[in-house]
Regions:
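Juxtamembrane intracellular "pre-TM" segments in multi-pass secondary transporters
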Residues: 5-11, 196-225, 249
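Extracytoplasmic gate region of multi-pass secondary transporters
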Residues: 36-37, 218-274, 329-333, 337, ...
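Cytoplasmic helix-loop-helix junction between adjacent transmembrane helices
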Residues: 112-151
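Residue-level signature of mid-helix packing/kink "hotspots" within the transmembrane helices
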Residues: 30, 34, 63-71, 121, ...
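Helix-breaking motifs and short loop linkers at transmembrane-helix boundaries and internal kinks
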Residues: 49, 81, 102-108, 119, ...
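Conserved MFS/SLC helix-loop-helix module at the cytosolic interface between two early adjacent transmembrane helices
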Residues: 68-104
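Structural signature of the two symmetry-related core transmembrane helices
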Residues: 84-98, 291-306
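Helix-loop-helix hairpin linking two adjacent transmembrane segments in secondary transporters
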Residues: 147-191
Length: 417
C-alpha cells in the first residue's frame, strides 16, 4: 500500500511536526516505564523490602494491565477522535507514575504501576496508526525509525534519571519527576488533527471482534507477532534486570550501573533504530520481505553475543558484547513495526497494533521479569538471565520463517492471508 490515508494528502511539514510531538511523547513513555527498574535496588533496601520475585511481579502488574487494556483502545485508534484518547492516556500514566512515589506498601506500588499500564496502552496502540497516516510506505520506515528511537533513548534516560535521583534524593522523588511533563505533552497532542483512516467504515462494519478475527486469519501477521513476543520476552528481561545484574555480578554501584547501561541503551538504540530504518528502506526497493529478513538475521546474530555478555566474569567483555548485542537487537525496531502497519489496510492499523501489544506482552515481558526473578531467587541472577538469548534465537528464527512464507505469496495474498 503506497497511499497516505485520510481525506487529503498531509503537507510534509505538518507530518514532521506530528512526528516530533509523538516522538517526544514516546520518549516520556519510556522514561516513566524505566524509572522503575532503575530504582529497584533502592526499593528493595527501603521499608517495602520486596523479594526479587515481588520486584519482577511489579513489572508484571504493569504489563498485565497494559496488554489487557490495549485491545480496547485498538478500535478507538481507527476512529476520528483518536487524539483525545491519546491525551487521556498520557494524563493517566503521568499521574499514576507520580502516585508510585507515595506508595507505602508493595500492593500500593503495584496499583500505581497498573494504572500506568492503562494510560500507556492508549498511547501505544493508537500512535503508530496516527503516524502511519502521515507517511507513505516508501518513507514510513524512516519516520518509524525516529519514533521508535525514542524507545531506547527514553529507557536510557529513565535509567540515568532514576539512578541519579535515587542516589541523591531517594527513589520516591524519581517517580515524582518522571510524571511531571505529562500534562504539557497531553495538551500538545490535542492540537494534532490526525487524518481519518480511509477504510474506517469497513472496520466499523466488522466490529472490534470481527476485526481481530480478520487479523488473526493472516498467517504472516501471526508469525510476526509471535516472533515479536519472543523478542519482547528478551528485551523485557534486559530492561528490568540488567541494572540489578551488573550490580550483583560485577559489583558496580547503582549510579555507575544505571549510567553505563543508560548510555549504552541510548547509543545502541538510536544507531540501531535509525540505521535499521534507513537500511530497511534501501533493501525494500529490491526485496518485498526485506524488513523481515533484516529483522530475523540481525536478531539471530545478537544471540551468541548476549550469551557471552551474561556468562563472562570480565566487565569489559560484558560491556562490549552487550553493546554489540543491543545494537543488533535494535536494528529491527523500525523495520518490524513498519511491516506490521504495511501488512494491513489503513482502517485496521490501530487494531493490528493493539492485538500485537496484547500478544507480545502476554507471551513476552509479562512472564520474563518474574521468571528471571524466580530463577534468581533459587540460584543466581547470572543463571536467571540466560533465558534471554534463548528467546532471541526464537524471535529471529520466527521472523525468517515469516519472510520465507511472505516471499511465496503475492502482495494481495499476504494482506488477506
Amino acid at each position: 500500500m503506497n497511499q497516505v490515508d485520510g481525506r487529503h494528502v498531509v503537507e510534509e511539514r505538518g507530518a514532521w511536526g506530528v512526528l516530533a510531538i509523538l516522538t517526544a511523547i514516546n520518549l516520556l513513555n519510556y522514561i516513566d516505564r524505566f524509572v522503575f527498574p532503575a530504582v529497584a535496588e533502592g526499593i528493595k533496601r527501603s521499608s517495602l523490602n520486596p523479594s526479587d520475585t515481588a520486584l519482577g511481579f511489579a513489572s508484571t502488574a504493569f504489563l498485565g494491565v497494559y496488554l489487557i487494556a490495549a485491545p480496547f483502545f485498538g478500535p478507538a485508534g481507527d476512529r476520528p477522535n483518536r487524539t483525545k484518547w491519546v491525551a487521556a492516556g498520557i494524563l493517566l500514566w503521568s499521574v499514576a507514575t507520580a502516585l508510585g512515589g507515595l506508595a507505602r506498601t508493595m500492593p500500593e506500588l503495584l496499583g500505581a504501576r497498573a494504572l500506568v499500564g492503562i494510560g500507556e496502552a492508549a498511547y501505544s496502540a493508537i500512535s503508530p496508526a496516527i503516524l502511519a497516516s502521515y507517511f507513505p510506505e516508501e518513507r514510513r520506515a524512516r519516520a518509524f525509525a525516529i519514533f521508535f528511537a525514542a524507545t531506547p533513548v527514553g529507557a536510557a534516560l529513565g535509567y540515568v534519571l532514576g539512578g541519579f535521583v535515587e542516589a541523591h534524593w531517594g527513589w520516591r522523588q524519581a517517580f515524582y519527576i518522571a510524571g511531571a511533563p505529562g500534562p504539557v505533552l497531553a495538551w500538545l497532542v490535542l492540537r494534532v488533527r490526525a487524518p481519518v483512516p480511509a477504510q474506517g467504515a469497513r472496520g466499523r462494519e466488522r466490529g472490534a471482534l470481527g476485526t481481530y478475527r480478520h487479523l488473526l486469519r493472516n498467517g504472516q501477521y501471526r508469525l510476526i507477532i509471535l516472533g515479536y513476543a519472543a523478542y519482547t520476552f528478551a528485551t523485557g528481561g534486559i530492561g528490568i534486570w540488567m541494572p540489578v545484574f551488573v550490580q550483583r555480578a560485577h559489583g558496580t554501584s547503582s549510579v555507575v550501573a544505571n549510567t553505563q547501561l543508560g548510555s549504552m541503551l541510548a547509543v545502541t538504540g538510536l544507531l540501531g533504530a535509525v540505521g535499521g530504518g534507513l537500511l530497511g528502506e534501501r533493501l525494500l526497493r529490491r526485496w518485498r520481505e526485506a524488513y523481515l529478513w533484516l529483522s530475523g538475521i540481525t536478531t539471530l546474530l545478537a544471540a551468541p553475543l548476549a550469551w557471552i555478555a551474561f556468562t563472562t566474569a570480565n566487565i569489559t567483555v560484558y560491556l562490549v558484547t552487550l553493546f554489540a548485542a543491543e545494537l543488533l537487537i535494535f536494528t529491527c525496531t523500525a523495520p518490524i513495526n513498519s511491516k506490521l502497519v504495511d501488512l494491513v489496510p489503513p482502517g485496521m492499523r490501530a487494531a493490528a497494533m493493539a492485538l500485537c501489544i496484547f500478544t507480545i506482552h502476554l507471551l513476552g515481558d509479562v512472564p520474563s521479569p518474574t521468571l528471571i526473578g524466580w530463577i534468581s531467587d533459587r540460584s543466581t541472577i547470572q543463571q536467571g538471565v540466560l533465558v534471554i538469548p534463548v528467546a532471541v534465537v526464537v524471535s529471529g528464527a520466527t521472523w525468517i520463517l515469516a519472510a520465507w512464507r511472505g516471499g511465496r505469496l503475492s502482495t494481495a495474498q499476504v494482506i488477506e492471508a
